[in-house]
Amino acid sequence: MYYLESASMDPAWNLALEQFVFDQLGPREDCFMLWQNDRTIVVGKYQNVLEEINSTYVKEHGITVVRRLSGGGAVYHDRGNLNFTFVARDCQGGMIDFSSFCRPVVDALREMGVPAQINGLSLIHI
């Protein structure tokens, strides 16, 4: 497994790096990537941006808005949260078991004394 840690806080750069890793490694290698963004709203592939954000607030506060290549809901990022990406070689039958990606992270956090737990499909709550 490859491990990458992005030094960039630029959300466009980090999403491009994520896509580059996916395109270059493809089905050959697994990769775990850690990254942070400056103040950003990341919207899912199929979301209507204007329905997901308060454009006046976003402009007034200098918040960047970017779209990721995958689906899912809109999320807010800033330097107070750490994002992780798994690029995995194989999904059994095309089905993704998100808990298999979250479980090692939760286990590592618990070993450090952080009371983490998995909620829902892919949410880690602390």
Model-predicted segments: where are they?
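Catalytic micro-motifs at enzyme active sites that drive phosphoryl/nucleotidyl and oxygen chemistry
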Residues: 70-74, 114, 120-122
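Active-site loop/lid in soluble adenylation, ligation, and acyl-transfer enzymes
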Residues: 1-52, 56
